[in-house]
Amino acid sequence: MITIEQLISQIEQRQPVLNKAELSAEQRRLSLEGIGNLTMANRQQLSFLANPHYLSSLANTDAGAVLITEEHHEEVPNDTVALIVAVPYLAYASVSQIFARQHSFSGIHPTAFIADSAVIGNKVTIGAFCVIGEQVQIGDRSVLEAHVVIEDNTTIGTDGVIKSQVVIGHDCIIGSHVRLHAGVTIGSEGFGFAPTANPSVTGWERIAQLGRVLIGDHVRIGSQTCIDRGAIDDTVIGNHVIIDNLVQVAHNVRIGDGTAIAAHTGIAGSTTIGKRCIIGGAVGITGHIDITDDVTLSGMTMVTKSITTAGSYSSGTAAMPTANWRRAAVRFRQLGRD
């Protein structure tokens, strides 16, 4: 159970609770056990109003407490505690973390293999069948779930969470407060090959990938995402970057601080993406280009050249009835003949 007082402390890491001083001692002691939407929440749950579309549900909510803006706080039922904040959705994000399920295992599992030269910090959890290579360093309070592999000479910062089946290649550097979800691969060999005179007969000459992957602090990487090591220079992921599931980041890519990347996006080698960019799902970005700061790419956009001006860019074709699409395709081909 989490008290209102504890919720306030968590929220105020990001923004103030504007009516904190007006809450009674009894209200501050109120305990909650979870989060629900305005319609379904019960007396032991917290809810929030982030979108005015759901305002009609506020008056009849049974939630024990509601995160609300100043504009709408008078519409909260009298028996529900109103926590007034500037951005309810951000407050909801903050408190969701303390309601999340905690790790059930702590310590080092007896089946884990840890090289003698590895340096393991204080209060580190290492799950079953993990493999920790030579000269690896793992920071304090980090958690490795089952079957994680960390190859030689890799460093992981403090307070990391590494889910099952993650593989981190040799010589990589992972910052603090990083979350790597199941099946993530960091530091795989980049896709680098030189053609021979006749690849169909003599094949392709493999280029050894000699760089590393460097990941900053407060980074979140979703399941089954692959980030390849650099060919010569490093692949670099900045601070506060969030990456969804099933994203491919090729060798030598550099991603700026605070950028968000949705699922199924592919970023080809040696491309640089600036700070605070938002990249939608299934975006394709060609190699050896630069994208400036504060660029938004809508879903399925194909980027084939550098973007030097901040703003929103799109290239995907929206769905339409098939007959209409066929007529539009004919006209599009005709435009190419002009």
From Swiss-Prot:
GO terms for biological process: lipid A biosynthetic process. SUPFAM superfamilies: Trimeric LpxA-like enzymes. Keywords: Acyltransferase, Lipid A biosynthesis, Lipid biosynthesis, Lipid metabolism, Repeat, Transferase. One of its GO terms (molecular function) is N-acyltransferase activity. One of its GO terms (cellular component) is membrane. The keyword Repeat applies. It comes from the Bacteria. It catalyses: a UDP-3-O-[(3R)-3-hydroxyacyl]-alpha-D-glucosamine + a (3R)-hydroxyacyl-[ACP] = a UDP-2-N,3-O-bis[(3R)-3-hydroxyacyl]-alpha-D-glucosamine + holo-[ACP] + H(+). It holds the Pfam family LpxD. The active site is at residue 251. The keyword Cell division does not apply. Pathway: Bacterial outer membrane biogenesis; LPS lipid A biosynthesis. Coiled coil: none annotated. Its EC number is 2.3.1.191. Catalyzes the N-acylation of UDP-3-O-acylglucosamine using 3-hydroxyacyl-ACP as the acyl donor. Is involved in the biosynthesis of lipid A, a phosphorylated glycolipid that anchors the lipopolysaccharide to the outer membrane of the cell. Homotrimer. Belongs to the transferase hexapeptide repeat family. LpxD subfamily. This is UDP-3-O-acylglucosamine N-acyltransferase. The gene is lpxD.
